[in-house]
Amino acid sequence: MDKLVSVVVPVYNAEKYIYNCVESIMRQVYKNLEIILVDDGSRDSSPLICDKLAQQDARIKVIHKKNGGVSSARNVGIEEVTGDYLMFADSDDIVDEYWVERMVQLAECWKVNLVICTYRLCKNTYEAMVPINHEKAFEPTWAMSKDEFYNVLGYMMTFRETMFAPWNKLFVTSIVKEHNIQFPEDMSYGEDFLFNLKYLEYCNGVIETREQLYNYIVQNADSLEAKYKADLFENQTRLYKAAKKFMIDHNVYKGYNVSNISYYYTKRVLASIVNQFHDKNDKSSLNTRKYVETIVNDLEVQEAVSYANLHETEMESCFTDMMMNRQYEKIYDELLKIDAGIKNRPANIRYKNEANMPYGIKWIPHTFKSIKKYGMFITFKRITGKISRKLRRK
């Protein structure tokens, strides 16, 4: 008989999405499932929908609890699971019908206890999903022992987005429970990575499939990076310190691991600084300057910047040089120019594609809301190969 796989789904005010999510799990080719829906004190009709779904399928168990956040909901779900394997899904996403089967097959075939799949990023729709040719795609992208994986952890953090989330992974339940691995409940951002990092301590190997088995639905295209996160720097520093300690403990904090993790952290520090210019930030200009000064003078930041000399774009390099010289006022002034300059004049911006856009330019959409009251126009000049076009935004 197939091993039992437990799927934990935290639910909070997801009445628009939860049915599609759970239905996609119920339709799995792999049938031996335990689906645990953890209602985290929802104020909409999500609890009722969850209960109705449980009446339709005996594999579904619903837990209702007071609101405590996504980490709390996942931890409660972990306490209830009885399966051999453990997986997670977010209530506003949907999964491919082979999501569970392929992950289990890889775990059993390669005898590893951590399997990772890739995913699709879908904006506001379930319609743009192209069926996968599973016969062609069922090959691992790579397979590594845990020691091999430790040696490339910095690279995986920096260049592989599959490292951070829990929903594209298959875990062994006994490892999670025996070592009391939980999601930190005192973090608003990045808690998933700390769970994964703790699990890596005890896994024997890691494998990744190229199949995009998970569909990550972005309900608001601006929500991923445009939200103001007051504790972004503190959370990112916590992740960096945890990863650095992990590398030191396993004697792999050297070579490219050092440069890659330093580059990862430096980019997050820059994001934290730019985040201070969000229109939701209620700090005064003086307090914002002081906060930027605190970030730039942080010892961890200074160390990371000194090693992060690889892969940098021109603007990143410019800001990195300023950070190394602790020129925090110049950083503040330069970022202020990015923000204020758009309000006062057209911005002609040249880039080949979004991935290669200068770092600060990625954040220009943050200013769109703030300039509406000025009635100004922004002209974007986008270049893709030899094709050029202008976009006017009001």
Kindly label every feature range from the protein language model.
Residues 25, 40-41, 54, 68, ...:
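Conserved short acidic donor-positioning loop in nucleotide-sugar-dependent glycosyltransferases
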Residues 39-48:
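A conserved acidic beta->alpha catalytic loop
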Residues 65-81:
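Glycine-rich, basic loop-to-helix element that forms the pyrophosphate-binding segment
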Residues 86:
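Short aromatic/hydrophobic "clamp" motif used to bind/position activated sugar donors
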Residues 91-233, 237, 250:
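Donor-binding/catalytic cores of nucleotide-activated saccharide
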Residues 278-394:
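Membrane-interface aromatic/basic loop that binds lipid-linked glycans or pyrophosphate carriers
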